[in-house]
Amino acid sequence: MELQSLIDTVSLQKLLLLGALLRLILIAYAFFHDQWFRVKYTDIDYMIVVDGARHMWNGGSPFDRTTFRYTPLLAALVMPSIWIANPMGKLIFASSDLGAAWYCYGVLKSFAKERSAKWMVSLFILFNPIVLSVSTRGNSDMLVTFMSLMVLSKFARRKCYQAAAVLGFAVHFKIYPIIYALPLTLGVWEQSVAASTNTWRRVVKTAVVVSICALMAAISFAVPTVLCYMKYGQQYLNEAFIYHVYREDHRHNFSPYWLLMYLNMARRHLGQGVDFSPRLVAFAPQAVVLSFVSYKLRRNTAHACCVQTVLFVAFNKVCTVQYFVWFIPFLAFLFCEPKEVEDDESGGSGAFKFFSWVKALGVVLMWAATIPLWVTTAVPLEFHGYSDFAQLWIVSCLFFLAMVVLASMLARIAYRVQCTKCSAKSIKVA
């Protein structure tokens, strides 16, 4: 009760300030950690981006830095790291955490109790250890999550064209937000269903809105992409887009597909060609489950995007820790307490009555436990050269199953919520 009273008295601005202070402390700690420890706190990807920015500032191309495989706009964004001090880029990425929390809170306020909204933002973004670690180590993935949450915030306020424009720009930074196009399109249809009982009118209105949204998204994607292509040519397309389609990572990859990639690499080295393409093997189940989830959870776009992202990460041919920040902030939409739901006789309320906290905690802990299990299994193979391929692949399969079980639980919660009368009234706008 004391904690509940405390969260009631703390404003969102104070929570954001505390989150910012914590991130400043971690960024400062990283400077000393990197000086004294062999394993650096700073992510290697951050060093690559800063090096790319340095090449750009010196009149060259960010792609002059080997393994720079991002949009040049990212290098331009961290240019203060060259002008002022190296950690400036980390401050920019950490600021995206705060922006993500702001937009997440804005969406939550439309259907969740204020206390619950604060708790969710604190738990899944501001003080979440994975989110904290990823952004303060200098990884840019939360920047795209920030834009994805901005899309949902615009959509929740019926600003569909603005949402589409932001989505197109987000896809320019990373390809994966394109998966939100289908649930957003179905969300537009559901909005038209709520606004009119005439089927023909709904179809026409949806077609017009979706067409304009598609045009807005295409323009906001094409403009920066064409400008970057005009400046850096085919190398930009190869590194920023095409590479990620053909990417095969057999190291630091939680996905079970890493073994197939490793065997393919060995066959190519021996000149024997490739038996199976991970792209095709991974894409087919991804497309099926994402389409199915989008349709079943179409009445709640926020829920659909959350479950979609978990499944996308689970079925992706490459999965690393920073990918977790793609979906962790979205969990706030599923575990919040809707404002228009009264406590029931058993003491549960809102979304809390749709699942057992014990069961939910067990599933989350099961998924979380597979992470250190995978790391401890991978270290002997990846750093010491021990031949533990079979053992690591089995652990990767366990991680995949844990992700699927987590997604299944989230989908069950979301479906039960949207099937209730209260969710139709209070959550549909999201």
From Swiss-Prot:
Alphabetized UniProt keyword annotations: Endoplasmic reticulum, Glycosyltransferase, GPI-anchor biosynthesis, Membrane, Transferase, Transmembrane, Transmembrane helix
Primary location class: endoplasmic reticulum
Pathway assignment: Glycolipid biosynthesis; glycosylphosphatidylinositol-anchor biosynthesis
Segments on the Lumenal face: 33-72, 137-163, 228-360, 410-430
Any single biological process term in GO: GPI anchor biosynthetic process
Xref: PANTHER family: GPI MANNOSYLTRANSFERASE 1, PIG-M MANNOSYLTRANSFERASE
Extra remark: In T.brucei, PIGM has a different substrate specificity compared to mammalian. Given that the protozoan parasite evades the immune response of mammalian hosts and digestion in the gut of the insect vector by means of its coat proteins tethered to the cell surface via GPI-anchors, it may be a good candidate for chemotherapy against African trypanosomiasis.
Protein name: GPI mannosyltransferase 1
Source species: Trypanosoma brucei brucei (strain 927/4 GUTat10.1)
